[in-house]
């Protein structure tokens, strides 16, 4: 569960950074 959460957060961060950039 913790691993999935980390992956999700990472994906969201990348997506947000990509969209913001």
From Swiss-Prot:
Keywords: Amino-acid biosynthesis, Leader peptide, Threonine biosynthesis
InterPro entries associated with the record: Thr_lead_pept (IPR011720)
Protein origin, superkingdom: Bacteria
One Pfam family here: Leader_Thr
Record GO biological process: threonine biosynthetic process; transcriptional attenuation by ribosome
Purpose: This protein is involved in control of the biosynthesis of threonine.
Family indicated by similarity: Belongs to the thr operon leader peptide family.
Protein name stated in the entry: thr operon leader peptide
UniProt organism field: Salmonella typhimurium (strain LT2 / SGSC1412 / ATCC 700720)
Taxonomy of the source species: Bacteria, Pseudomonadati, Pseudomonadota, Gammaproteobacteria, Enterobacterales
